[in-house]
Amino acid sequence: MDVSLLLNVEGVKKTILHGGTGELPNFITGSRVTFHFRTMKCDEERTVIDDSKQVGQPMNIIIGNMFKLEVWETLLTSMRLGEVAEFWCDTIHTGVYPMLSRSLRQVAEGKDPTSWHVHTCGLANMFAYHTLGYEDLDELQKEPQPLIFLIELLQVEAPNEYQRETWNLNNEERMQAVPLLHGEGNRLYKLGRYDQAATKYQEAIVCLRNLQTKEKPWEVEWLKLEKMINTLILNYCQCLLKKEEYYEVLEHTSDILRHHPGIVKAYYMRARAHAEVWNAEEAKADLEKVLELEPSMRKAVLRELRLLESRLADKQEEERQRCRSMLG
């Protein structure tokens, strides 16, 4: 076996089990990548969580399309066709896996993955912990851990090799489509149709990212597109907050802030997501940053801080009540 560390990727180790053929495929933005995967725990039994071959349906993702588990794009773009490789991924990359897995299982069971409802009660409320409907995924969500992904790369299709409406547009048409998609996303959001709104924002982001690949990074035109992309990503995150997809919000907002540390809305959204998953200190730090960068948001920041303190007090009271009941 050929063991190698993926360069410039913290918390990822790769082991090639079967070498692929030819050169690395051209993974351009918009390429559709088809692959089989098996997800395992890092315990002695290498407990299998999901296996696409057992489902009988390979997985596919679109490069640059904000796939929930962003590290998979990194893993796949290191592979050749036919290659089988095992990737150990640290917890920093696997926090959103339970939500992805839930969606994949819902699809495999013939259910609509957007129709599920979040339920909280009793002990679950105490930890602000939402059931995903699968016991093993609930456990993973409560206690994130490193995971192993066994991946077999089957196919890479360029944007013009499969049917995707966005790619039927030329550059000028793509740019014209962006404000229309943005506006439609806003309209759907106001109607409370958050899944559909998120899809519109994603389509607009894909258009812009494709245009951005034609510009020199960090120059004027590239930065103009980057600003538009960040605005749409934050709109997308607003939908995720409504859908209670808090860990994905943390990923997207943190990624924006790594490259653009002055975006106030990203700090504000990340603070709200941190608060929902009981990262109280992180939430407070982000809210303080909002206040530092935008003093005019003082009223909104104080409201969020009061809400956080109230929820923390409720949680502590539930814990006290639980301890009393356990002691009889």
Curated annotation (Swiss-Prot):
Keywords of this entry: Cytoplasm, Nucleus, Repeat, TPR repeat
Tissue note: Highly expressed in retina.
Domain PPIase FKBP-type: 53-145
rRNA-binding keyword on record: no
Encoding gene (name): Aipl1
SUPFAM superfamilies registered for this protein in UniProt: FKBP-like, TPR-like
TPR repeat locations: 178-211, 230-263, 264-297
Classification via Pfam families: PPIase_AIP
UniProt-recorded name of the protein: Aryl-hydrocarbon-interacting protein-like 1
Taxonomic placement: Eukaryota, Metazoa, Chordata, Craniata, Vertebrata
Quaternary assembly: Interacts with NUB1.
InterPro entries: AIP/AIPL1/TTC9 (IPR039663), PPIase_AIP (IPR056277), PPIase_dom_sf (IPR046357), TPR-like_helical_dom_sf (IPR011990), TPR_rpt (IPR019734)
GO CC term, one of those recorded: cytosol
